[in-house]
């Protein structure tokens, strides 16, 4: 045996300490926290180099994870389906039948048809991310810039619970949260102040829809139960869609036209 390998020799003779594996596991668990602490305290060129190294490590790790996932998922065989008599359990195993393609196309067309409305404002100006979301700098040295504050009017439901402020990425100020909208019925030519039920679609971005941001052209759902509208079957209509026609952040109120 080579010199200076006395620890390995001792382990071969007498085995490991009883708490060795537990201590090793705990040390490995602490390592992530220690690296994080080290990264926070570092400044200057040393910090830049360290972050670059960590960035490269993370990319490599993500690539490895992706490779493992690819290996585990079953790949679809695009080869032609064998001609002739095929047992029932092998039918539709490989390749796509023409009927399946047609069925999917019809389903897709139905979805598209269902998603279209005749709206008062068919085209509106897109709202950029810099316009809607203001960057909030945080951290000891105000270096972190992952938080965003919504600068437009938004709707937040009654069941919404805030995350702890430290972990909240999108901040929606109380002053910009609206609960009611002035909705005009195009046939009755009358305006009603109705409670908002939710934001159906913001034309600028799906992110704004999930955040409940209300800008010009947004389709919102309003409670029309007090209007007394009924269906052909005699049931009271509870909610209906309306499109916002003004800029609520400038006017201080939401004006919308009911989609009938």
Swiss-Prot record:
Keyword Nucleus listed: yes
Subcellular location(s) per record: Nucleus, Nucleolus
GO MF annotation terms: RNA binding
Numbered residues of crosslink Glycyl lysine isopeptide (Lys-Gly) (interchain with G-Cter in SUMO2): 80
UniProt modified residues of type Phosphothreonine: 81
GO cellular component, one term: nucleolus
Start and end residues of each stretch annotated as Disordered: 20-41
Chief location of this protein within or outside the cell: nucleus
CDD domains, sorted: NSA2 (cd11381)
InterPro entries: NSA2_fam (IPR039411), Ribosomal_Se8/biogenesis_NSA2 (IPR022309)
A Pfam family hit: Ribosomal_S8e
Highest taxon listed in the record's lineage: Eukaryota
Any one GO BP annotation for this protein: maturation of 5.8S rRNA
Motif mapping: Nuclear localization signal: 11-18
Basic and acidic residues bias locations: 20-34
Keyword Membrane among record annotations: no
Function, as annotated: Involved in the biogenesis of the 60S ribosomal subunit. May play a part in the quality control of pre-60S particles.
Family: Belongs to the eukaryotic ribosomal protein eS8 family. Ribosome biogenesis protein NSA2 subfamily.
Subunit details: Component of the pre-66S ribosomal particle.
Annotated PANTHER family: RIBOSOME BIOGENESIS PROTEIN NSA2 HOMOLOG
Protein's name according to its UniProt entry: Ribosome biogenesis protein NSA2 homolog
Organism: Homo sapiens
Lineage: Eukaryota, Metazoa, Chordata, Craniata, Vertebrata
């Amino acid at each position: 045996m080579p010199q200076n390998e006395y620890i390995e020799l001792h382990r071969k003779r007498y085995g490991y300490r009883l708490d060795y594996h537990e201590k090793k596991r705990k040390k490995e668990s602490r390592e992530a926290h220690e690296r994080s602490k080290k990264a926070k305290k570092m400044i200057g060129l040393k910090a830049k180099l360290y972050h670059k190294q960590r960035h490269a490590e993370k990319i490599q790790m993500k690539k490895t994870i992706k490779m493992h996932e690819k290996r585990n998922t079953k790949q679809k065989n695009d080869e032609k389906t064998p001609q002739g008599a095929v047992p029932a359990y092998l039918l539709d195993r490989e390749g796509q039948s023409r009927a399946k393609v047609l069925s999917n196309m019809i389903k897709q067309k139905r979805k598209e048809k269902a998603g279209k409305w005749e709206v008062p404002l068919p085209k509106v100006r897109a709202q950029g991310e810099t316009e809607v979301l203001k960057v909030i700098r945080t951290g000891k040295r105000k270096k972190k810039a992952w938080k965003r504050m919504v600068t437009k009017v938004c709707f937040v439901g009654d069941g919404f619970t805030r995350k702890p402020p430290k972990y909240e990425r999108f901040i929606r100020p109380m002053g910009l949260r609206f609960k009611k909208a002035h909705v005009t019925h195009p046939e009755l030519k009358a305006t009603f102040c109705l409670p908002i039920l939710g934001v159906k679609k913001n034309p600028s971005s799906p992110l704004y829809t999930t955040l409940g941001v209300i800008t010009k052209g947004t389709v919102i759902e309003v409670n029309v139960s007090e209007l007394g509208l009924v269906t052909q079957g005699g049931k009271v209509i509870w909610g209906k869609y309306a499109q916002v026609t003004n800029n609520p952040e400038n006017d201080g109120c939401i004006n919308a036209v009911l989609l009938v």
